[in-house]
């Protein structure tokens, strides 16, 4: 519900600014078994791959979770645990959380923000939190508007694309990752030919 409200504001703002927006919802409850399986087997099912691809192709992300045991849901963190570390580099992200009490208001900034910093995303400055008493509070709408505006402006700037185009090779990538740095290795050298059993030129 909170993510939907942020997405609606972001889409409306983007359209007012002359952009066409398609909102794709990834409901982790529908792929919970796929996420659990991937954690223990490293095998990604087609349904999970579809969700991962949706994030990889998105211009921006709204990452929203309920709070359980004073932290993001285990399903939420497990999903991001199975992602390629390079998938979301420089991707604009809004962090959002809901809980049954305002005592968990800092979960988005204290616990979610470090996770997305590790994934090297571009999280917007404003996170959004809602407890039951917040839904009718105009202050929540103000934060939603602010976060949506920050997201749209980052998406419009093409920041993520520019980072990939201009400085992708300066990031540390793992073999076989979305970074694909192994493809930059020159295989047509004497050393590589010798390593593969061929003769040096």
Predicted feature residues:
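Hydrophobic alpha-helical membrane-association signature
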Residues: 2-6, 108, 147
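Generic secondary-structure signature for well-ordered alpha-helical cores
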Residues: 8-16, 117, 121, 149-160
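Helix-loop-strand module that forms the ligand-binding subsite of alpha/beta enzymes
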Residues: 43-120
């Amino acid at each position: 519900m909170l993510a939907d409200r942020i997405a609606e504001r972001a889409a409306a703002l983007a359209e007012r600014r002359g952009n066409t927006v398609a909102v794709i919802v990834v409901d982790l409850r529908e792929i919970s078994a796929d996420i659990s399986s991937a954690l223990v087997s490293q095998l990604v099912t087609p349904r999970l791959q579809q969700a991962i691809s949706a994030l990889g192709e998105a211009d921006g992300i709204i990452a929203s979770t309920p709070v359980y045991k004073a932290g993001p849901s285990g399903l939420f963190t497990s999903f991001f645990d199975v992602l390629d570390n390079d998938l979301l580099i420089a991707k604009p992200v809004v962090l959002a959380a809901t809980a049954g009490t305002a005592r968990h208001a800092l979960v988005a900034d204290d616990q979610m923000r470090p996770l997305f910093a590790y994934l090297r995303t571009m999280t917007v400055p404003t996170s959004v939190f809602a407890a039951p008493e917040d839904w009718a509070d105009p202050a929540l709408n103000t934060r939603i508007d602010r976060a949506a505006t920050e997201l749209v402006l980052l998406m419009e700037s093409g920041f993520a694309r520019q980072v990939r185009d201009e400085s992708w090779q300066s990031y540390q990538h793992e073999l076989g990752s979305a970074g694909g740095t192994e493809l930059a290795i020159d295989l047509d050298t004497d050393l590589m030919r010798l390593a593969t059993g061929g003769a040096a030129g």
